[in-house]
Amino acid sequence: MAKSRKSNRDKSKDSNWQERVIQIRRVSKVVKGGKKLSFRAIVVVGNEKGQVGVGVGKAGDVIGAVRKGVADGKKQLIDVSLTKSSSITHVAKGVSGGAKVIVRPAAPGTGVIAGGAVRTVLELAGLKNILAKQLGSNNPLNNARAVINALEGLRTFSEVAQERGVPLEHLYT
């Protein structure tokens, strides 16, 4: 008799999230009867306000794999501290597998200068002025995870001042 209000709440909460598929790949598993085919989707989820996550989903059809990838990406969200010019505070490096990514802050008006999966992650994180370079592997999943690792390593000025135990005004004097 009681109606569920959960569905209305979920729609309003999820409306500001964007999702982009980086890669869809057909994968197979060898079983006794032959090969069992399935699809693997790598999905980036972000709100362009400083939250982003990378998820992987695998299912028998593409739509199911993307849906699982979005759910996985929302479980692995990280917070990125943005500056007033929609950039980052300092240079950061990230590694995942054989992929290495270097991200550098850029002047206002520069735009996102990056390629492939790295560009997608940075755009969905809300970064508008940033430079990035991929080194090593071209694997989209490892590059996406490497840029997530780089963004996790970022610290704000207030965090640095708190770690050093000095007021923010006296940080660089």
From Swiss-Prot:
Query: Superkingdom, according to UniProt?
Result: Bacteria
Keywords noted in UniProt:
Ribonucleoprotein, Ribosomal protein, RNA-binding, rRNA-binding
Among SUPFAM superfamilies, the record links this protein to: dsRNA-binding domain-like (SSF54768), Ribosomal protein S5 domain 2-like (SSF54211)
What are the residue boundaries of the S5 DRBM domain, all occurrences included? 17-80
The positions making up the signal sequence are none
Any one Gene Ontology MF annotation carried by this entry is: rRNA binding
| Keyword field contains Ribosomal protein | yes
The terms describing its cellular component in GO are: small ribosomal subunit
Keyword RNA-binding among UniProt keywords? yes
The record's listing under Gene3D superfamilies reads:
3.30.160.20, 3.30.230.10
Q: Name one Pfam family in it.
A: Ribosomal_S5
Q: Which GO terms describe its biological process?
A: translation
Quaternary structure and partners:
Part of the 30S ribosomal subunit. Contacts proteins S4 and S8.
Q: Which family does the record assign?
A: Belongs to the universal ribosomal protein uS5 family.
According to its UniProt entry, the function of this protein is described as: With S4 and S12 plays an important role in translational accuracy. Located at the back of the 30S subunit body where it stabilizes the conformation of the head with respect to the body.
What does the UniProt entry state concerning the protein's domains? The N-terminal domain interacts with the head of the 30S subunit; the C-terminal domain interacts with the body and contacts protein S4. The interaction surface between S4 and S5 is involved in control of translational fidelity.
Q: What is this protein called?
A: Small ribosomal subunit protein uS5
Species for this entry: Crocosphaera subtropica (strain ATCC 51142 / BH68) (Cyanothece sp. (strain ATCC 51142))
The encoding gene: rpsE
